[in-house]
């Protein structure tokens, strides 16, 4: 009898995902790729027992994601006692729509003969379009309360389990008032239809966002007592002040590295910026790749505003104070224009922790490289001289590190106060160095992108926005950038703040 290993295969290799569109005689493959992981379906080991030569092919119509699953194998394990091959249909059924289990001829015929395909338009409203590398793309936004959106999303739900770590598919059968809180953004490429009846749209990716009610403690408007009729008028979720949270965010593998993620993120940010009821934009449990994308996109958004107001670190916050008068704490308001920065953050609706990351990265970039750790700054001398260093840029760098340490201490105070003072100082020093390394990597990426943009503008006269956005996702997926970001995230826990007592319902999907 063959060993168990002979009957076990890698689930990630066995599953093949294919996007198809009508061809001359049968559906034509547009792209084919494997999942990033399959543990939500096949367990932590991501293996399938009981088959040799197993192929699980998931096909999706490129425009409306009409699904089909086809399973083939060379040999199946015969049950011995309690040991049997994995029941693939039973295992896959919770993750794939029932319509996917039709016969292959029926599916191919449905794709070939779909008379509605040529008139297909993504649901919702066209909110952004752009051209990248000579190809045209569109982003559409629609409410989850729209039945067409729910149908399309239900077909795409399996992507959550295959590409979004710790992701949970959305519950699309909730009451309408709950569904209205959700907006789904679809990214499509406009392609040349291969046949007269084929669609001109091909899916690229999508994102889901939802509104989370935001309690405003200090409302400028004082309520007045009136004799209004009871019951009062109906209040919809869209009328209430809210945080907007990005829940799921996915660009399919064939389209990654081409800037679509940044276009999608900035489109969501623009919608947030233009909605007077949205207070700020946040992200649920972002991974390192998305963190890098978000940082570079927000840096691109905020940097012109920082430059416009000459935001920088004051190297002499104690200029008018004697040594006895100097406070023991970091003089934040004397170092940076806190009121101005608060106004900028509120205007652009960036979450406070994310804004701090972008601000710190900008301030670091304003210090000459030779005065930074990455440029060979004399750290021993800085440790001795501190804010008394002769060079004002050395003083700026000293105060930059102190500002970062102050933020990190506030965020992780409960953990750090349990350490001895020497260990606490060592931990903060280590963490701020890791944070700085992460920022240096992102600054390097952004600087290279800006230089490429300038060259591209000179050659073709292309708009700055388009040229910058094309390169951003490729940059965010750079392995060294991800490594640096990982250091920053796990040395000291530093996440977007959440309201205490938040229900699990609000955190169903994970990015």
Swiss-Prot record:
Record region (Interaction with histone H4 N-terminus): 44-46, 210-212
Can you tell me which residues bind acetyl-CoA? 249-251, 256-262
Mind listing the UniProt keywords for this protein, alphabetically? Acyltransferase, Chromatin regulator, Cytoplasm, DNA damage, DNA repair, Nucleus, Transferase
Quote the catalytic residue positions.
284 (proton donor/acceptor)
| Catalytic activity reported | L-lysyl-[protein] + acetyl-CoA = N(6)-acetyl-L-lysyl-[protein] + CoA + H(+)
The compartments listed are: Cytoplasm; Nucleus
Keyword check for Protein transport, yes or no. no
The site feature described as Interaction with histone H4 N-terminus is recorded at 182
Alphabetized PANTHER family for the sequence: HISTONE ACETYLTRANSFERASE TYPE B CATALYTIC SUBUNIT
- Which family, according to the similarity comment? Belongs to the HAT1 family.
Name of the featured protein = Histone acetyltransferase type B catalytic subunit
Tell me the organism: Aspergillus oryzae (strain ATCC 42149 / RIB 40)
Q: Which gene encodes it?
A: hat1
């Amino acid at each position: 009898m063959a060993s168990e290993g002979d009957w076990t295969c890698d689930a990630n290799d066995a599953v093949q995902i294919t996007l198809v569109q009508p061809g001359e005689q049968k559906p034509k493959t547009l792209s084919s790729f494997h999942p990033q992981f399959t543990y939500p379906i096949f367990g932590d080991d991501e293996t399938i027992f009981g088959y040799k030569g197993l192929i699980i092919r998931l096909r999706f119509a490129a425009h409306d994601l009409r699904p089909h699953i086809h399973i083939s194998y060379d040999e199946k394990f015969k049950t011995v006692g309690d040991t049997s091959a994995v029941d693939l249909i039973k295992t896959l059924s919770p993750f794939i729509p029932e319509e996917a289990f039709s016969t292959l001829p029926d599916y191919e015929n449905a794709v070939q003969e779909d008379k509605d395909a040529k008139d297909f338009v993504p649901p919702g409203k066209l909110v952004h379009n752009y051209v990248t590398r000579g190809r045209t793309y569109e982003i559409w936004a629609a409410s989850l309360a729209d039945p067409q959106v729910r149908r399309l999303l239900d077909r795409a739900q399996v992507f959550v389990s295959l590409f979004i770590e710790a992701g949970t598919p959305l519950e699309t059968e909730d009451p309408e008032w709950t569904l209205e809180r959700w907006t789904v953004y679809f990214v499509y490429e406009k392609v040349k239809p291969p046949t007269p009846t084929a669609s001109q749209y091909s899916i690229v990716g999508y994102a889901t966002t939802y509104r989370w009610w935001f309690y405003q403690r200090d409302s400028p408007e004082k309520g007045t007592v009136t004799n209004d009729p009871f019951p009062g008028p109906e209040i919809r979720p869209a009328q209430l002040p809210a945080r907007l949270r990005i829940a799921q965010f996915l660009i399919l593998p064939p389209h990654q590295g081409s800037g679509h993620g940044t276009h999608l993120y900035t489109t969501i940010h623009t919608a947030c910026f233009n909605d007077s009821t949205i207070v700020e934009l946040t992200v649920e449990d972002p991974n390192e790749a998305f963190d890098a994308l978000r940082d570079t996109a927000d840096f691109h958004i905020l940097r012109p505003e920082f430059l416009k107001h000459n935001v920088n670190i004051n190297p002499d916050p104690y200029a008018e104070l004697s040594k006895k008068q100097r406070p023991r704490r970091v003089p934040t308001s004397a170092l940076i224009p806190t009121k101005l920065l608060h106004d900028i953050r509120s205007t652009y609706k960036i979450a406070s922790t994310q804004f701090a990351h972008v601000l710190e990265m900008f301030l670091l970039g304003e210090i000459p490289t030779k005065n930074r750790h990455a440029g060979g700054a004399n750290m021993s001398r800085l440790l001795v001289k501190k804010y008394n260093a002769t060079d004002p840029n050395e003083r700026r760098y000293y105060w930059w590190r102190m500002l970062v340490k102050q933020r990190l201490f506030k965020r992780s105070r409960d953990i750090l106060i349990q350490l001895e003072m020497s260990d606490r100082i060592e931990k903060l020093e280590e963490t701020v160095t890791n944070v700085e390394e992460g920022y240096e990597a992102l600054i390097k990426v952004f600087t290279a992108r800006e230089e490429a943009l300038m060259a591209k503008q000179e050659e073709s006269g292309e708009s700055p926005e388009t040229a910058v956005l094309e390169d951003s996702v490729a940059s965010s997926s750079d392995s060294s950038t991800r490594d640096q970001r990982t250091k920053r995230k796990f040395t000291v826990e530093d996440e977007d703040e959440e309201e205490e007592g938040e229900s699990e319902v609000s955190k169903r999907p994970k990015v």
